[in-house]
């Protein structure tokens, strides 16, 4: 018995073969072996230790006869001389029979002989256990399907068995011992570590097969992922011939798997130096069922078995211990925790299949549960989807009780049973295993789908048919194209980070996949033959989108980083580089179409641009006649809107804008929403920023399908993008894509996010980018080579570097203070706004040109008749003057859009722009008749009048966007009361008042704000004149408060005809709508124009004497009529009233000319109804004395006291205050 068995065991032949090669030519052996082989001394082999050599059989030649032996002397007996080996002893040479072939066993074969002989010295026994293999089989299918979809590779049964053996050894360390004689004494040696020996079958160059046993060292310290990596490393190096001496030594327990050859039960030999060897047999059904059909086996609940044997050294391991060891392996292979650990280690986010007892219920009962399970996946499958690339909570499986087969009374034994599915996945019957495969592929992989909240069954079916059907994998060319987009996205950010360290750019790092996603949206729109995609997005990633989607030249982007300004675009304040817009043309890579692409300008106010985009797109659609009123290729301009997750859930304008989606006055035929969900809002976690499960839950209010997709899967992102466009085209509805990703850096490049999200950023800091992960996947699948990937990235980086160097060489323009935009647009000096009487009469007649059989409400008919009368006889009121202005513009070919809450009728029952049939509810719009000339030809004009949703923010934003999208349209929005316009303050501040100065974005939008103190309380009084005057500068807007119907008429017509695009803010009347004094004659419409300053009629008609005036009252709006009535009552010839109709820009020349006509004025007062700190006074009190010091030095105010609210809530207090103003004015 050897006291020191070879450390290489059955691998000794390989070591000796390497030694012979090393001895003959050291360079022929891997250098890692040199140090060992220098001192190696091979033991005698079987063929050299005895005379038992075998040779190739040949004809036997008789030996030469030996001389006759001499007689033996009669001496004392001597020890018998050694004779030739007797036949019974193995050392004796055998003589092959004639015709036999013999071969000397060398190398591996000789080592096998030696090792088998040595193994005879080990007294062994064997324990045998049959273990159910079904759970291992089913979970291996789940594992390998996941690996196939993700990083590639496979898990074998041997991987699982080997790991189970290692875990069992932890409970039974004696199984890891081996026997040795130490100092002449029998000893049981317990190694410090478990070194699992793997029997690896290798095929040589000559085709001969050999077996080596290499060790996975220190297995007990490894988790499953580490164990698999070490396992695969050993196998790979064995097949590449790169194993080292260290790999062969120190095996403590072995695993052999003859089951791969079909062997069911094996009792392997145990080599010296080991305590046990585990044999794994083939997986088979019990013999008595091997002739049964699959259906019968499934019905009976029969599973395959695997037979494990434990052959152990009986000197140190007892049978009970070996049996318990196998029982522990048995338990592990059926244990929930064992497979839970494996799934977590492999990054599989789903629960493993569980070992449960078969449920004896009938197949009919179970069939109903299967149908319920299908419905559950359609409803809740998204809750189990693997959509978070960070997997911050990697200890929790994505699961839901409704999606657990066990919750439905089903078990793993039902997986191979067939059930009726009534057309699910296009078939009538299907195995539960296949049903689950379809459901999980459809709803639980890298895409989670929410659609069962949609009320229309047709739309649900449409989605089901597409997501439950296996979709084609992208072609290699398409994969390379996706990779090129990822390359471009990442390289752009890396370049800017390197070249412009510390500059804010709000990078897209961590969310680069949105670039191929957006590209897929635009490409699919082009595939459908659409006209344009208009994009709105926040600042994060905007520069990347400008460069890689819109196609803005890199040189221009880099110039903006360098601080270079284009002199031709230098007017106005400008804006930061990540707020600017651009336009471009997208050309399909794999198609023949192209499509226009534009990116709207936006402020930092998140989501404020949403309604602006919708309005802009609707305007473009109406221009192309493909909007709500169009018929061919409806809604051919597509809004593509990007959001942040925190903003989408948190900003109310999102819900306001979504609410417009299906309204006839606001529909755009479906918006594609992409939420770039980086799972954080600056420093706020989702748990603190929303109460809903998803940031996108708000979109369910309009029945929009929602696709949650893992941003680390570019192919899934591109597939979802194309599906979203197809749905939009099929149903003209919004679609929401929630792309989960992360933010590589802080909110901006100077921020350290680890201060508030340390764990998240520990994960992010070690995470590979999506480009690298996708590249590795493509290379691993053999779709591209490493060189192709590196070349593509280098080419893009080189292109950026060249442009960067060119920009650095540009001559920098000297930076000067910004210039005003005021001079960029001027109203024509001789613009005619009057119309002839025939036009007035035509509009009047239109109000009674009712459709045949149309029944007018009895309270509305007098209004229509009165309008026709006014058109012919005069005394035209405010409401009709407005309709005359709009109708005449329509007749001249202008598209007029008027919207607001209750706008068709008017808040104050004054407008009646749309007449409703008393009996049928049909609508008649008189002004639409003006779109046709008397001879029947179209004028080109159109009247679009809509009641809006009860919204200010979204409604005003939409109309602003519409005015940008169609600069030639007359776009008006009316507040229900002027007080409510502050609900749209962000739109007013960020777009209406400053859009031109910041972005050169022009708008002609008109805001009609009912304003006036009439005792209705603080929320029904003021349109906040002071706020608009504070915002006004550089001619950014026109602000007016006309006091006569005719002046209002001319103001609107001037705005519609002046050819410039600047917003118009009009403070319109309420009580004055029915003031009999507030009317205008026909000649005021046919002969006049807008007058920014108005004197009293008595002076313009020559009836009053201006020289008698010593007290001048300047005012604006409704209070003029109260002042005029008081003056007439008191016959005050010393008092004159001058109205400033245009509050901004101030008509300084006309104002000065008017005041010069009153030479004897001693006192000048500004009279207003508003409190002292509101209305026009805060502006006029400062600017009038400044711009006209000769006329307004000493100007005094008459008004209500300064107040925090616009007015008193008491009508009686209001009356007292109003009287006090009048008394003071004439005091």
UniProtKB/Swiss-Prot annotation:
Residues 88-97 have a biased composition (Low complexity). 2-oxoglutarate binds at residues 579, 604, 1020. Its EC number is 2.2.1.5, 4.1.1.71, 1.2.4.2, 2.3.1.61. Residues 23-102 are annotated as: Disordered. Residues 783-814 form a coiled coil. Disruption phenotype: Cells lacking this gene do not show any ODH activity, in contrast to wild-type, demonstrating that this protein is part of a functional ODH complex in mycobacteria. Residues 60-76 have a biased composition (Pro residues). Residues 42-88 are annotated as: Linker. Acetyl-CoA binds at residues 1038, 1054, 1089, 1092, 1142, 1149-1150. Belongs to the 2-oxoacid dehydrogenase family. Kgd subfamily. Is a fusion protein with two major domains exhibiting structural features of an E1 and E2 protein, and a short sequence stretch of E1 localized at the N-terminus, which is connected by a linker region to the rest of the protein. Homodimer. Interacts with the FHA domain of unphosphorylated GarA. The 2-oxoglutarate dehydrogenase (ODH) complex contains multiple copies of three enzymatic components: 2-oxoglutarate dehydrogenase (E1), dihydrolipoamide succinyltransferase (E2) and lipoamide dehydrogenase (E3). This is Multifunctional 2-oxoglutarate metabolism enzyme. The lineage of its organism: Bacteria, Bacillati, Actinomycetota, Actinomycetes, Mycobacteriales. The gene is kgd.
